[in-house]
């Protein structure tokens, strides 16, 4: 089964393998998805820069892909990783560190 990229970018929810904690949300196009499969490291598509980026390429906070899950509509991906360092560019462990309720 493959993701359906016919409508463009797909959301990719990245979670930590051991804890299942949500680390970040990013977007993948087909090229980012294929590079992720090929390298076993996360690749995403930056909507603001309109280009691919490899998580941790400059910071060293890489994500080693352990598994990928596809939702029932084939239009969203869960990426299970072993995270090296913080996942968030702010230095926080997760991008979801602001509690609302």
UniProtKB/Swiss-Prot annotation:
Example GO molecular function: zinc ion binding
Pathway: Amino-acid biosynthesis; L-histidine biosynthesis; L-histidine from 5-phospho-alpha-D-ribose 1-diphosphate: step 3/9
A Gene Ontology cellular-component term: cytoplasm
Keywords on record: Amino-acid biosynthesis, Cytoplasm, Histidine biosynthesis, Hydrolase, Magnesium, Metal-binding, Zinc
Highest taxon above the source species: Bacteria
Cellular compartment(s): Cytoplasm
Subunit-structure text: Homodimer.
Similarity comment text for this entry: Belongs to the PRA-CH family.
This protein's name: Phosphoribosyl-AMP cyclohydrolase
Lineage: Bacteria, Bacillati, Bacillota, Bacilli, Bacillales
